[in-house]
């Protein structure tokens, strides 16, 4: 029996040494294994001691009780020993005749009990450390949750601010573009009305020229000269000469009036072209400012550069049109000067051929003026087409801005999905940390 108890203690010591060598494992696994092994070893020792007490009645019986820490309370109960000394009055000599092997077995048991107590203390300290670690992890988890909530709120606020700013910019730009388009349409309508009025006025002036003395217009200058040559009396000569002079003065006045009207019309067109150029320059400056602000807010847009190029090309075309109008004005001034020279040279009645040439020249000038007016009408049509293209560009820009707003909404949705994923991960980590229970030593 003694040899069996020694073998048990020896194997128990070997198991303890192997358990100490395996202490490099994680804290939680070590605590679980050590708790199980300690429970098993304590039961074996209690059974061993009870068996020995049954076989040796004269021997001192000892009962050991190991109390573990409860999961709710961290207080540690020390082990108590109950020594029940049973003395047999009729067999005192039997107790005196005990062998030294029994004494050594008792000392080994006491050593093992002391070792077990030390190990229990170590396990309790490790449990305390693990509880402290759990508390720290809970604090860190709460901090991370709070940070994630703050970041989510900040991102939501930023997204809301950006969307509001984009909506305001889109609304403001749309409003300005609508106003610009309406103003341009009004200008085009006014120019069209002015051109129609001028055409009507020219038609009326031509009708007036045609209706000057229709009876006298039927006669040519050659017929009037023939009448003067065939006239017998001085009264007929004076009458026919007065008719010729009156016709010349009337044609001269009509030509002067027509040239003055054309000059005033050209001056008005020049002023309108200059004002239009100034307006376009102001619009270009305003569009540049808008492009700068939009580039500061949204750097990834490149449509503004195309708009600037289109406006620059439009400005160049308008400058070229202005230069052409100025050249036409200079040409008309030169023509007026030449007409004045012709009027000063052809005051005499003897140069009938020169008068015919002058009349033909005036007719050619009328034709050229009509051609120039047709060119002006074509230029106005081109300007209307350019305005239509600008309106199409504004619509495309509006569509681009709507696409950008849609992309911003999609980005906000992606950010919300990421935040939801992070919240799910945090919930999973909480569940994992909450399900990890600590077992105590029994």
UniProtKB/Swiss-Prot annotation:
Record's keyword annotation contains Protein biosynthesis: no
Molecular function GO terms recorded: identical protein binding
Any one GO cellular component localisation term in the record: nucleus
Coiled-coil intervals, chain numbering: 107-212, 253-435
Annotated keywords: Chromosomal rearrangement, Coiled coil
Bias (Polar residues): 12-35
Tissue occurrence: Expressed very weakly in heart, liver, skeletal muscle, kidney, pancreas and fetal kidney. Not detected in brain, placenta and lung.
Region (Disordered): 1-39
UniProt keyword annotation of Cytoplasm present: no
InterPro entries: MIPOL1
Recorded disease: A chromosomal aberration involving MIPOL1 is found in a patient with mirror-image polydactyly of hands and feet without other anomalies (MIP). Translocation t(2;14)(p23.3;q13). MIP is a very rare congenital anomaly characterized by mirror-image duplication of digits. MIP is occasionally associated with dimelia of the ulna and fibula, tibial and/or fibular hypoplasia, nasal abnormality and other malformations. Most MIP cases are sporadic, but very rare parent-child transmissions observed in familial cases suggest an autosomal mode of inheritance.
Protein's recorded name: Mirror-image polydactyly gene 1 protein
Source organism per UniProt: Homo sapiens (Human)
């Amino acid at each position: 029996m003694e040899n069996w108890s020694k073998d048990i203690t020896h194997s128990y010591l070997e198991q303890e040494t192997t358990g100490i060598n395996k202490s490099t494992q994680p804290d939680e696994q070590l605590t679980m294994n050590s708790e199980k092994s300690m429970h098993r070893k304590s039961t074996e020792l209690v059974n061993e001691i009870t068996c020995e007490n049954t076989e040796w009645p004269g021997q001192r019986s000892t009962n050991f009780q190991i109390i573990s820490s409860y999961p709710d309370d961290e207080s540690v109960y020390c082990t108590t020993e109950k020594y029940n000394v049973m003395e047999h009055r009729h067999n005192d000599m039997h107790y005196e005749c005990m062998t030294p092997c029994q004494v050594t077995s008792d000392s080994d048991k006491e050593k093992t009990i002391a070792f077990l107590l030390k190990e229990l203390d170590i396990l309790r300290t490790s449990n305390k450390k693990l509880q402290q670690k759990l508390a720290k992890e809970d604090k860190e988890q709460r901090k991370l949750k709070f940070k994630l909530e703050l970041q989510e709120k900040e991102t939501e606020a930023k997204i809301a601010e950006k969307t509001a700013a984009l909506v305001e910019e889109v609304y403001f730009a749309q409003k300005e573009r609508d106003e610009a388009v309406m103003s341009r349409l009004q200008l085009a309508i006014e120019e069209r009305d002015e051109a129609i009025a001028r055409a009507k006025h020219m038609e009326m002036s031509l009708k007036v020229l045609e209706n000057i003395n229709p009876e006298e217009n039927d006669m040519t200058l050659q017929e009037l000269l023939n009448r003067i040559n065939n006239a017998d009396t001085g009264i007929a000569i004076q009458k026919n000469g007065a008719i010729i002079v009156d016709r010349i003065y009337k044609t001269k006045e009509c030509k002067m009036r027509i040239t003055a009207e054309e000059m005033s019309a050209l001056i008005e067109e020049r002023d309108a072209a200059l004002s239009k150029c100034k307006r376009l320059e102001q619009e270009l400056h305003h569009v540049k400012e808008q492009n700068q602000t939009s580039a500061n807010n949204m750097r990834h847009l490149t449509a503004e550069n195309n708009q600037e190029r289109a406006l620059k090309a439009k400005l160049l075309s308008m400058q070229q049109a202005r230069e052409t109008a100025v050249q036409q004005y200079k040409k008309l001034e030169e023509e007026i000067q030449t007409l004045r020279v012709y009027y000063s040279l052809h005051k005499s009645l003897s140069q009938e051929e020169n008068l015919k040439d002058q009349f033909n020249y005036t007719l050619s000038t009328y034709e050229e003026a009509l051609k120039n007016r047709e060119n002006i009408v074509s230029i106005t049509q081109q300007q209307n087409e350019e305005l239509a293209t600008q309106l199409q560009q504004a619509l495309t820009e509006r569509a681009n801005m709507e696409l950008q707003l849609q992309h911003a909404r999609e980005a906000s949705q992606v950010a919300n999905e990421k935040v939801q994923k992070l919240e799910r991960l945090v919930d999973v980590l909480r569940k994992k940390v909450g399900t990890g229970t600590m077992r105590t030593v029994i």
